[in-house]
């Protein structure tokens, strides 16, 4: 006595999100990140590291680093953040010792981004408050792959 195999009982692997991008293959990259931010007639330079999936088309990651600001860049403000991107659209949130900043922007495959955000300060004399504009680059040539 045998059983006929039905196509309706076929087991299919679960779909990944986002379904249009098959980038999650068990590797993450540690990448240097540089940025320039302007807000409230003040500017700063940012240097840090980004930990993200190994796809440049879509995905996301976390980063940490510091802003260097003020005359002769003596003011140092640490910051951590999370962001997500899909081709041309990027969005995220950053948290520093002085403010929280949600932001959205345009991304060129997460190699170069231009973000606009709004910094909500909690410090008495914050580096940023109000609207912000950032230019961000992840230096993918210096990426270091890490297995999950």
Where are these regions (language model features)?
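Extracytoplasmic strand-loop-helix segments at the start of, or within, the mature domains
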Residues: 49
């Amino acid at each position: 006595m045998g059983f006929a195999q039905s196509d309706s009982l076929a087991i299919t692997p679960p779909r990944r999100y986002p379904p249009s991008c098959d980038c999650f293959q068990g590797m993450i990259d540690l990448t240097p990140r540089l940025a320039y931010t302007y807000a409230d007639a003040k500017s700063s330079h940012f240097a840090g590291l980004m930990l993200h999936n190994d796809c440049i088309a879509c995905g996301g990651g976390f980063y940490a680093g510091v802003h260097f600001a003020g005359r002769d860049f003596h003011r140092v403000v640490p910051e951590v953040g999370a962001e997500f991107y899909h081709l041309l659209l990027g969005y995220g949130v950053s948290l520093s010792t002085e403010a929280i900043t949600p932001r959205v922007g345009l991304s060129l495959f997460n190699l170069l981004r231009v973000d606009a955000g709004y910094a909500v300060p909690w410090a008495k004399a914050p580096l940023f408050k109000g609207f912000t504009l950032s230019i961000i680059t992840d230096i993918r040539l210096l990426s270091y792959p890490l297995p999950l």
